[in-house]
Amino acid sequence: EEIDLAFQAAKRAFDKRILVDMDAKNKSNMMRAIAQKLRERKDEGGKLLSQENGKTIKQCVDEFKGAADTFDFYAGLTDKIENKLIPSGHDTLNYVVLEPFGVALQIVPWNYPVSIFSGMVAQNWIVGNTIVIKPPELCPISSNFYGQIFEDVGVPKGIINIVHGYGETTGRK
C-alpha cells in the first residue's frame, strides 16, 4: 500500500511538471544546497551509517562526502542537457529529443547505500523524473537522514519518495 501511495505522489508531482519546468539554475541551486547540507552533516550521517552497516565511521563519512560530490557534479550538468541536431548525411536528419520518462522506481543495494542513493536521485533529478526509491532494509536509517535533508532544503513534495520495506514485497510491487 505504501509503495502505491508513493507512486501516486510521484506521478502527481510529475504531472504537475515541477522538475520538468524548473529552470536549470533553480535545479542546480537546489542540488548544490543538498550537497552543502550533506557536507555540513557528514559526521552525523557517517555515525548513523556506521551503526547500521558496520563500516568504520571514516568510511561512512567519506561516503557522505562522495554523495555531496555527486550532487555537485550533476548540478553542473543541469544546463548541459539539451535537444540537439547531430551531424549526418546530406539527405537525412538525425536529432536527439530529451524528455523525462516519468516516475523512476529505484532499489538501493546495501553495500554503498548513501553513494548509490545520491547517484540515483541526482541522475533522475536533472532530467525531470520524479522518484520512488526503496532503500535497503539492512540500512534504513541513512535514507531517513536523506529525507530530512531533502525537506530542509525545500525539495517539493512528491519529487523524491522514500519507501521502506523488504525487497521480496516492496521491491517486487
Where are these regions (language model features)?
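Rossmann-like NAD(P) dinucleotide-binding subdomain of oxidoreductase/dehydrogenase enzymes
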Residues: 50, 82-173
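Glycine-rich loop-to-alpha-helix module at the N-terminal edge of alpha/beta enzyme cores
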Residues: 1-81
